[in-house]
Amino acid sequence: KEADSISKLKSDIIVLDRLSTTGNWMSHLKGKFKTLVSMDDIGSGAATADIVINGILHDLPSKKNRYIGYKYLFLENKYFSLKKNNNKKVNNIVVSFGGYDKRNLATFFLKSLLNKNCLLKKNLNIDLLVGEIDHKTINSWKMLIKNILADHKIKINLLIFPLDYFKRLSRADLAIVSGGLTVFDTISRGIPVIGLPQYKHQLKTLINLERKNVIKLGSLGMKLDKENFINLINKMITSLEERVFLSKNSKKLFDKKGSERVLNILSSLF
């Protein structure tokens, strides 16, 4: 039904952004448009698309009209210039697990901070940036935050869909994020990152980025382990050398021209 609805759109070009299309689904669209473009698609339907642009997921073999690799990352360019050099101390941590926190990683993060070994220094600021969520979960987070603040003289801001998201992100000394587009928005700004996966394909992304020395994986595979996570947070907070190492590598990996490249590809179709 969805494919039928899309096929009725009056357009020469259709751009799809779906993780895993099927050949049958894409075949309903093939021929209904002059050009069928699929982005970050690792499904069987990608073979049906006229053009594939995969900036995040690189599992497809290279072929004509396939643009694969980080050089085609389509990222928000706001506040790139605000990122300062790495501070000697971590004063500001930004935490974001995407618009939909499937695994409730925010709860895992907050409960981890209750660990007695967690090094939360005085006057540390934490921005917990969340998407759409129910009131029950929000109230549980507020209770966890209250318990954390009872033991630590820090500040935790719980912000739902903040309008200044990228501004806050750009000012982070350390970020804890999931493995979707959020991790690329973060490391492209040269911010040291601890990554936690929402899904198995995100784990694959995070492992690949860790191998390139631009992030640290905060989980044991898909397993969330508080002790392991807190030890890593402590290491990142106390080691300027580690943060600078990740930051320098991320700046080398991303040239911030991915959005321009993608727009040029799409513009050439007109």
Where does each model-flagged region fall?
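Acidic donor-binding loop of glycosyltransferase active sites
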Residues: 170-181
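Donor-nucleotide binding loops and adjacent catalytic segments primarily
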Residues: 91-171
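C-terminal "capping" alpha-helix adjacent to the active site of nucleotide-linked donor transferases
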Residues: 216-217, 224-242
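A nucleotide-sugar donor-handling region in carbohydrate enzymes
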Residues: 47-104, 136-137
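Active-site and donor-binding regions of nucleotide-sugar-utilizing enzymes
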Residues: 1-66
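Short hydrophobic beta-strand element within catalytic cores of glycosyltransferases
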Residues: 175-177, 192-201
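A short, well-ordered alpha-helix in the C-terminal region of glycosyltransferases
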Residues: 235, 242-256
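C-terminal alpha-helical cap of glycosyltransferases
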Residues: 255-270
